[in-house]
Every structure is written in structure tokens, then in C-alpha cells.
Amino acid sequence: MPSAVVEEKINSYRPRVVERLASAGEMLAARQEMGGNTPGNVPPWPGSSDADFHGSLAAVWVWSRAQQVLGDDRFSLNIASAWNFIESSWAEFIPRTLGAHASDEAAYDCAMVLRAWLAGGAHSIDDESARREHVVQAARLLGAYITDLDDLTGREFKDPGFLVWTLGDYARASNDRGLGATARRFVEAAFGMKSPPPFASEMPVRDGLFDFSCTTATRVLAVIGAEGPIPFVGAWLRERVASALPQAFVPRPMDENTWNACAAATLGYAFSVATDTTFFDAYKSLMDELDLRAEVGSLGRTTGFSGETSATFYYAMATASILGKI
């Protein structure tokens, strides 16, 4: 497709992206704790005071992306406070190794450290800073975890697609060839370049507490993360992935808003790489429904739930993805 047509479609969404990210940022800023025992923490839902490590990192991602599209620094205090919370509570959430003793969420926590760092332009921070040391530690832990990962059936916090996608993006941004090779080896062995199954055929979680990650979508993101948004990957998306895209919002018994937002984030980003209207049309179909379900930039896990930090993060990713920012 001619680049002018692609730009026209992307730019048609730009005002909506600015509005949604600004609203999501304001909601999360209002939720953030600025005093008490955990200053800087962003609790997972209204009325909660739980310390939420990856939720606070998700908020950093939203605020950072919002500032980029707004062209100002209105959330800079929120970002700094959230990073202070992350650094002060690091030992509580991030173990020395991601072995059997680590929590089920530890690998995801490491990945979210990297996603927040990537979104915020924090790679300009001095390599000797404590934050940079924590980012490097999270990357090394995640790389070792992925190297030893045999179970490809993980969902939610253990979704290998999300973890490898994040590691690949980080490796490219930090020019870490070793971690980049780790991501590529995993993708080649676990996923390859075969056609994924239809997104809508993905089985729901039956016995868990969450079903927020569309693992078919994150597998696609893992390939893009490992290889980069290059023409070869664009051809793969057009030839092998386009036929698997959902044609409408996919009903799910649990976390259907977040699951569809995860899928939409992949479709929007893939459109910027593949430049094929099949991806744009599928993206628009999901986003039209998600926009109806969202309230002032905030999204609940499913119908009837109030705005939740994680669901809002995935909705914000979906919103921004059409600009190639994810």
C-alpha cells in the first residue's frame, strides 16, 4: 500500500490517541498514592490500597506515552514518584533469580520494568544510576528465564510471547546483542514463522483468576520483537498472519475487554509494519467496541467492572499501537 494511504489512516486516529492517553493518564494520576506507606504506588482498582508493582509500571508506560503525544511533561511528577516506589520496593517483588521460589508474577514484573523503561525514554539515564542498574538486572533475569523456559503453554503473567517480545524490544533499544540472540533463538524454536491459529479460536482459561493475554497476538509480537519491524516481517504478517485476524470483538467468559485490547494492540502495531488494510480493518473493529466500553480513557476487565490499572494499560497500548508506539 502506498505510504501516503497508510499515513492517512494512521493520522485519522491521532486525535483519538491523544485524547484517550491523556484521559487514561489523568485517571491513573488520580489513583496514585502520594503519601502513606507506599508513596508513588498505583493501586490496581478504585478503593484498593494494595501495592501493585507491575501496575505502577503500567501507569509509567501510559504517562510516558501520553506525554510523547501531548508534547508536554504534565505527568513527570507521577512518573518520578512511581519509579521511586519501584526502586524502594524492588527487593520485595524482584528475586535474585526467577527459579522455582519466585512468584508467578516475577517474570512479568521484570518485563514490565523493561516496557516502562522503553516507553519513557529512560535510556538517556546515566548507566551508573540505580534505576539503570535495576533495568539491567530485570533484563538479565528475564533473559535467563527465557533461555531455560520449556513450558510454552504459559498464560497471563507467564505468557512467553509477551516476555520474549519485551526482551527483543529491549535488546534492540539497548544494543544488547546477547539478549537479542536469546530472543531470536526462543522464537525460532518455539514459534517459528508458521501461520498462527485464528485469534478467535484461542481457548479461554477455565481454572484461573485471569485471562487478560491474547497469546495468539503476543506470539505475533514476539516475532516482531525478535526480528524487528523490518520488510521481511511485514511480508510474513501479510502472507501468514492476515488470514488469522479476528473479524469482530471476541466474546470471552473472563477478562474479555483486556484480552481484546491485547489483540488490538498487536493489530495496530502490525499494521504499521505490514501496511495492509486487513490489519487496519480488524484493528478498527476491535477498537470501535473497546471505545464504547471504556470510560474516560479507562477500561474495566469486562462489562460491569470499574476501570482497572492493567486493563487500562492494555487499552492504552491498543490505542497507541496504530502510531507504531507500543
Predicted regions span which residues?
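Residue-level detector of extended alpha-helical repeat arrays and alpha-solenoid scaffolds
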Residues: 56, 76, 110, 160, ...
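Non-membrane alpha-helical segments in proteins
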Residues: 48-69, 109-119
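The feature captures the catalytic groove of carbohydrate-active enzymes
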Residues: 112-129, 136, 150-154, 158-172, ...
